[in-house]
A protein has these predicted regions:
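Non-catalytic cap/lid and distal C-terminal segments of serine-dependent acyl enzymes
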Residues: 1-146
């Protein structure tokens, strides 16, 4: 996938091409060729950094496809972002302690108050880096498909 968004112009980023490929091509291919549980309730999407931004956009655009959402240093969800909370089984938000952990923690508080199953994780002494994301994945994985 190519995208011509330049540094500092993130608002110009378009996820449409990736979303179409993922939803209309990749997921149907995987479901047709591998032993999967091809239902929304058995599907998760998570991403780190820019992949988190893509994850947020796609999960909000396609709520009938995914039930578990994970943003690893990829922003937050607000309760008003999600139109039908009955479709969402888990929202996992994480970041490094040297990023902006208060945003993640406050978002999870708001999501919980709105009735969502939401979890935050802050990786101590890390920033926007792979150690943060490895630790975050370690925390997220056991929460999926429960």
């Amino acid at each position: 996938m190519t995208n011509n968004a330049r540094f500092g112009r993130i608002r110009e980023f378009k996820v449409d091409t990736f979303q179409t490929m993922l939803i209309d091509e990749l997921i149907p291919y995987v479901d047709a060729n591998f032993r999967t549980m091809a239902k929304q309730s058995h599907r998760a999407m998570a991403g780190l950094s820019m992949g988190g931004m893509e994850t947020k956009t796609i999960t909000l655009n396609k709520p009938d496809v995914f039930a578990y959402y994970g943003l690893l240093s990829g922003g937050t969800y607000a309760p008003a972002d999600i139109k039908d909370k009955s479709k969402v089984k888990l929202i996992f938000l994480s970041c490094g302690s040297k990023e902006r952990p208060d945003g993640v923690k406050n978002a999870v508080i708001a999501l919980k108050e709105a009735g969502f199953n939401a979890v935050s994780y802050v990786s101590e002494n890390t920033a926007h880096e792979f150690l943060t994301w490895r630790r975050s994945l370690r925390e997220l994985a056991p929460l999926l498909f429960q």
